[in-house]
């Protein structure tokens, strides 16, 4: 069994308002090993993305990580200063966002942006950095990488922009990549290509992956293990085949049963009864 890379214990993230603190993430425990792909699954509002942002220290006011440990390679990230976290982000831990335009500056050429991701963390000649950028674009399947380094983001399709975002995340060979629904807005064909590339890259470099999604089909295809989130908590986790083939928690069963593939043609789609609790309904003693 591979070494533990990320060990999260009792993570709680709250958003402060005049009425008090409201828990978006409420006691999350999560372990990720080197080279492992973990799917973090749940419906909108379950706390998936807030968990991902919390791990990287990217929660802005009025949000705050109020409790828990986030141990990366044995070091508690919550005890690091902002400069130490800045050196970690994009270097040892990278993140890929749902919208690649959150990663890419529209007025800078792709090559400039990619080279900056290297030069921020390493003192290498610019020509060497650009060669690594070219190789990264080639790795994610972008044709004519030399030409594309001189292109602007608007000259790429949505799928190609997402490939660029993946290439940027891989530039410094991080130990962990957090992916926040990076294929949600893409068509099925492009989604399949990107999933294949991500699996290939992770296996080659022994990179661990946290794949945040609401799509159980993607998790079944991509992940080694899955953690199911509901109302800010992980309610079930385990090897992906075990959880999807024999779910033990009612919410996990409800998610699986509501998939179109589980419904006969012409039959009414099944849905989970009731509604997920709001922040106010699940408010606890978070401070």
Q: Where would I find each of the regions flagged by the language model?
A:
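Short catalytic/signature loops enriched in Gly
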Residues: 2-4, 143-147, 239-287
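P-loop NTP-binding/switch modules centered on Walker-like glycine-rich loops
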Residues: 43, 178, 186, 190-268
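Conserved ABC ATPase "signature" region
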Residues: 76, 128-147, 256-257
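Conserved ABC ATPase signature
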Residues: 151-156, 160
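A short, proline-enriched helix->beta-strand linker immediately N-terminal to the Walker B motif
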Residues: 171-175
């Amino acid at each position: 069994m591979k070494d533990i890379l990320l060990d999260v214990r009792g993570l709680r993230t709250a958003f402060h308002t005049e009425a008090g603190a409201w828990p978006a993430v409420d006691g999350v425990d999560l372990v990720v090993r080197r080279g492992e792909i973990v799917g973090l699954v749940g419906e909108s509002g379950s706390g998936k993305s807030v968990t991902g942002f919390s791990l990287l220290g990217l929660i802005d006011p009025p949000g705050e990580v109020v409790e828990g440990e986030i141990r990366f390679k044995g070091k508690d990230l919550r005890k690091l200063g902002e400069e130490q976290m800045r050196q970690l982000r994009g270097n040892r831990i990278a993140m890929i966002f749902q919208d690649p335009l959150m990663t890419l500056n529209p007025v800078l050429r792709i090559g400039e942006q990619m080279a900056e991701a290297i030069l921020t963390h390493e003192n290498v000649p610019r020509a060497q950095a650009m060669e690594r950028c070219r190789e990264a674009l080639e790795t994610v399947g972008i044709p004519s990488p030399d030409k594309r380094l001189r292109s602007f983001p608007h000259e790429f399709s949505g799928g190609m922009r997402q490939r660029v975002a993946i290439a940027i995340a891989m530039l410094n060979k991080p130990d962990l990549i957090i992916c926040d629904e990076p294929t949600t807005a893409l068509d099925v064909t492009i989604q399949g290509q990107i999933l294949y590339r991500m699996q290939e890259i992770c296996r080659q470099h022994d990179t661990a992956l946290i794949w945040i999604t609401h799509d159980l089909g993607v998790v079944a295809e991509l992940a080694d293990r899955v953690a199911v989130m509901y109302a800010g908590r992980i309610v079930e986790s385990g090897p992906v085949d075990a959880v999807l083939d024999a779910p033990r928690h009612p919410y996990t069963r409800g998610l699986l049963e509501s998939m179109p593939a589980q419904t006969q043609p012409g039959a009414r789609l099944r849905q989970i009864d009731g509604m997920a609790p709001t922040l106010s309904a699940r408010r606890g003693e978070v401070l």
